[in-house]
């Protein structure tokens, strides 16, 4: 049986990390695509040597020719300008929108049956534009953001509670930005609701509030520490988990930026919600019940995403 083909559109730090993880997880052959052929070729060559150490027979190649993505089973899009200190996701929109047009058009032309995962920021607007440019159905284009934000929330909660992160279940919904909605009320630790742990004295409400705020600014915290780049290990791990669920028909549930058509009262936008990913792509969108405060926060987050989408339409008439 032939191996699957994984295309990584963007061969920067996230792209290189994705390629390494895809090789280690034996997901299939890997093609790194970038505007200049040498960096992806260099990383592919280096990773081929690493594959020999790992005993992996995957074929890793680098290219600048978009035609080389033909027949891809999965495309993970990281291309574009990453965040820098003092530059928020919104400021990246005008720069990265043309990149989404180029890659989206290539996906629609060369691999229209692929499952596409977008990492490029501002994520919810970029995945919306990518789907429009590609012409792919909504179930086959998804944004990674909520998986990463939820992982940060789970990590911070596990650290504060002194428990294994595997015991913490928590989701962050809404847009992948400062208005995201960490659902701490619905979080559990070993099956015990987080509010119950507050009553038991395991953690204070103030500590939870601080964790919520740190989750919202987690990306900026990494950017400010790295200075010359944004996060790349965690985003790559998140995207690989999504790709693995698709390729293996695992039907895992993730908080991810999906195209909504009436769910949560939202239509025509990509917003972070719980989705089940299997061989059919996004196979289910799970609608949770919010309390009044959660609904208020979610509505505000959706409004922020909608504003970015309107900016996309203003910048590119073809999206209007």
Curated annotation (Swiss-Prot):
Q: Which family does it belong to?
A: Belongs to the LDH/MDH superfamily. MDH type 3 family.
Gene label: mdh2
Protein name per Swiss-Prot or TrEMBL: Malate dehydrogenase 2
Q: Where does NAD(+) bind?
A: 10-15, 34, 96, 119-121
Q: Which NCBIfam families match?
A: MalateDH_bact (TIGR01763), PRK06223.1 (NF004863)
**Stretches of the chain forming a coiled coil according to its record:** none
Which reaction does this enzyme catalyse, per its entry?
(S)-malate + NAD(+) = oxaloacetate + NADH + H(+)
Q: Which residues form the active site?
A: 176 (proton acceptor)
Cleaved signal peptide residues = none
Q: What does this protein do?
A: Catalyzes the reversible oxidation of malate to oxaloacetate.
Tell me the organism: Rhodopseudomonas palustris (strain BisB18)
| MF terms (GO), sorted A to Z | L-lactate dehydrogenase activity; L-malate dehydrogenase (NAD+) activity
One biological process term in Gene Ontology: lactate metabolic process
Question: Which Pfam families does the UniProt entry name for this protein?
Answer: Ldh_1_C (PF02866), Ldh_1_N (PF00056)
Annotated positions binding substrate: 83, 89, 121, 152
Q: What is its EC number?
A: 1.1.1.37
């Amino acid at each position: 049986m032939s191996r699957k083909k994984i295309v990584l559109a963007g061969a920067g730090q996230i792209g290189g990390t994705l390629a390494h993880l895809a090789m280690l997880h034996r997901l299939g052959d890997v093609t790194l695509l970038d505007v200049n052929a040498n960096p992806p070729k260099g990383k592919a060559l280096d990773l081929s040597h690493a594959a020999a150490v790992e005993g992996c027979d995957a074929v890793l190649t680098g290219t600048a020719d978009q035609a080389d993505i033909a027949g891809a089973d999965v495309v993970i899009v990281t291309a574009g300008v990453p965040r820098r200190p003092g530059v928020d996701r919104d400021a990246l929109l005008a720069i990265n929108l043309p990149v989404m047009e180029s890659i989206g058009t290539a996906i629609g032309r060369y691999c229209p049956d692929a499952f596409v995962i977008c990492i490029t920021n501002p994520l919810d607007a970029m995945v919306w534009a990518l789907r429009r440019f590609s012409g792919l159905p909504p179930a086959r284009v998804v944004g990674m953001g909520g998986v990463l934000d939820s992982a940060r929330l789970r990590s911070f909660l596990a650290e504060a509670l002194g428990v294994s992160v595997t015991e913490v279940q928590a989701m962050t919904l809404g847009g992948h930005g400062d208005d995201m909605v960490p659902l701490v009320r619905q979080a559990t630790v070993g099956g015990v609701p987080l509010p119950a742990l507050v009553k038991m004295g395991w953690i204070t409400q103030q500590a939870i509030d601080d964790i919520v705020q740190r989750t919202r600014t987690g990306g900026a915290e990494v950017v400010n520490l790295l200075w010359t780049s944004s996060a790349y290990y965690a985003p790559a791990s998140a995207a690989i988990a999504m790709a693995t669920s698709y390729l293996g028909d695992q039907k895992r549930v993730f908080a991810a930026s999906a195209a909504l058509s009436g769910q949560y009262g939202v239509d025509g936008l990509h917003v972070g919600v719980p989705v089940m990913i299997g061989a059919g792509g996004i196979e289910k969108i799970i609608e949770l019940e919010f309390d009044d405060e959660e609904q208020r926060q979610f509505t505000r987050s959706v409004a922020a995403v909608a504003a970015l989408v309107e900016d996309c339409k203003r910048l590119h008439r073809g999206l209007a």
